[in-house]
A protein has these predicted regions:
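A short, charged, amphipathic alpha-helix used as a generic interaction element across diverse proteins
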Residues: 13, 24-45
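Short, mixed-charge low-complexity intrinsically disordered segments
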Residues: 36-75
Length: 75
């Protein structure tokens, strides 16, 4: 199953969703975020992962208002 990486956050007072691509597996999708963090010298204090009933995985990475969503795109 492929997964779309989405970043949910705020720019000013406006909620935004930025899509960062579709990957073949959940692991590849999550690694794409880790690689971006490494490239940009960012290290989260923690990653809290939650799985939703629809198969979406989301990461809380300590920013309080920004999250990564890994959305399943079908078989």
């Amino acid at each position: 199953m492929s997964y779309e990486v989405q970043w949910h956050g705020y720019e000013g007072n406006e909620k935004v969703i930025k899509k960062h691509g579709i990957f073949n597996t959940l692991n590849e999708a999550q690694n794409s975020v880790r690689e971006w963090w490494k490239k940009n010298n960012f290290e989260p204090y923690y990653i809290r992962q939650c799985m939703l009933e629809d198969g979406t995985c989301w990461w809380d990475y300590g920013s309080y208002v920004c999250f990564y969503y890994f959305v399943p795109k079908g078989e």
